[in-house]
Amino acid sequence: MSNGIVPTIKLSMELTKVLADIEMNGLHINTDILTSIKVKFEKELVDLQKYLNDKVKYFMGDTPINLDSPEDRSVLFYSMKVTDKKMWATRFNIGYELRGNTKKPKRRTNFESIQDFYIEINSLARPIFKTHGTICHNCQGTGKYIYMKKDGTPSNVKRKCKTCDEKGLLFTNKDERAGLKLKPRNVIDCSAMGFKTDKEILESYLSTASDEVHEFLVKYIRYSAIRTYLRTFVDGMQKAISKDGMVHPQFMQCVTSTGRLSSRNPNFQNMPRGNTFPVRECITSRFKGGKILEGDYSQLEFRVAGFLADDKQVLKDVKNEVDVHSYTARILGVSRQKAKSDTFKPLYGGILGTPKQMQYYRAFKNKYSGITRWHRELQNEALMSNKIKLPSGRQYFFPNVERLRSGSVTNSTAIKNYPVQGFATADLLPIALINLKNLLTKRNLKTIICNTVHDSIVLDVYPDEEQQAITTLKEAMMSLSNECEERYGFKYTMPVGIELKLGNDWLNMKEVYKSNG
């Protein structure tokens, strides 16, 4: 195995040329489809907003709630309001701190029992009740009043009404508790404004929520997602489209800590899957009669972890075609796509979650004991040398790593995550991209590479070159084992699984080839 970083530098230099070609090639956007997607989901957004506003009034009475405000959402969802934010942050140790030269989240306060946690919450936050609002007579419901000068004439300046705190209404409490009454489960649920209201946290409450609360949570999660999709992907894409209907994202090798590629203007790395938001449908071929071909590596990071850890159980499961994401989904009772994040959590040393998730994480650690052992070795390596080294020669430095009383180390997640993500997407995928570009040129094909996303490669296929493009992409993606030996001095012995899909656009595609390796 290589001990130097030269092979990874050479790979990066070769990849730079390929990425330059991909940027120049760009992707073709069907603007009619993009516009129809925008119109459809803007309508859904309006309908969701009306539903949510009506329900907020039902849950809160006349108390105004701004769903864009983390503090207001915390009040709405948890029915409590923090009385002293500074003391709250201090008691639960919320915020960031410098560890070496890096800002990291503070380690949260550890309570002896859940009862102690609730006692602390109740001492620093007050319950919220539904309200009845009446017009503030001081400002006549405007929230501001006209300041009178000393000579008795009205000023042109309107001042904030302190009587109603600029709300225009005066509120009196009813006897009924307001909000959705979610119950925080541990200190991780706490935030600077009260309690967390992100998608992952809210989804974790769905299984125990009443029908009424469940419906509201689902609608809010959908509302938040659509807003993000419209702003980030539709609006971002529309701004980036050139006169010829193309977008040319910029690809960068030096932004992420792991070496994984990132892109901007617009960002194509976090493009939503079709079952959540169909923006991929507007990505079509630039060629009349052309197709879009995508090649995906199957469970690449899971297989890479098994290879780096020399975990025999991973190799056995891969050879027996065990779908680890489906296995996770069955245990947790969620979709395969949603299960992916839970599959990867123990892969990177994750231990926190719902009781069901934590049970799965423990089962994962026991089943894949080779990965568990390897995690300990990585931590020890980081402690001894302040760095970890991949067989490719790539190195990650952790100058301020320390042993914790729990037996773990600081930067534990990064120490376990970086080698897997880095080797998979910074050391292996570029090999396939470079080989693919060389093969397309050698075979004089007009088909071009137009995108790459983490562990996949996207081609714009010239008419009548479909079969040649499939064969060429398959050959490039399956070349990892021999190429690793040639470039890095070792053989990648884990079976390489790939799946190829072809379609008229990047969303509506049919499988044309699949191999487990």
Specify the residue positions occupied by each region the protein language model found.
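Conserved "right-hand" nucleotidyltransferase catalytic core of DNA-directed polymerases
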Residues: 1-274, 289, 358, 362-363, ...
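Glycine- and acidic
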Residues: 2-4, 22-23, 27-35, 215, ...
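Conserved catalytic core of nucleic-acid polymerases
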Residues: 17-20, 24, 131-161, 165-170, ...
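Secondary-structure transition/capping motifs at alpha-helix termini
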Residues: 25-28, 43, 59, 83-84, ...
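Polymerase palm active-site segment centered on the conserved acidic dipeptide of motif C
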Residues: 36-71, 364-373, 464-517
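Short conserved micro-motifs at the rims of enzyme active sites and ligand-binding pockets
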Residues: 78, 304-307, 508-514
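Function-dense linear segments that define catalytic or interfacial modules
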Residues: 249-335
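A structural signal for short, well-ordered beta-strand segments
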Residues: 297, 455-457, 498-500
